[in-house]
Amino acid sequence: MLISICMATYNGAKYIREQVDSILNQEFTENKDVEMELVVSDDGSTDDTLKILESYGDSRIKIFHHTEHKKHKYLNASRLCKCNFENAMRQAKGDYIFLSDQDDVWYPWKVDKQLSVLRRSGEAVRKLN
């Protein structure tokens, strides 16, 4: 089973390494059949966000550039963030999609536990923090 973790980024260099490390180091004890991809949509970062992401050299990290913000200068920040997440989700190939902010840090068991709840319940959508 493939899961996609979608992350929208914009000038997140200050925090992104800690978050990416916490995602790539997820432990799967209940769901041993899981493969993971980290789908990143960057909205034109001008700091080192992309350089940091590229430095991993990890095939699980897929980076996409979101350029819609250039067409929609009138949109507020929350709308632009939503569009950036949508771009990541369009690229996702997983059976399940998890959303990640660029400045979060996840517990090592987060995805495993949430995936177990989703599989047991049979629900397609569930908000789990």
Please annotate each region the language model reported:
Residues 1-129:
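Nucleotide-sugar donor-binding/catalytic module of glycosyltransferases
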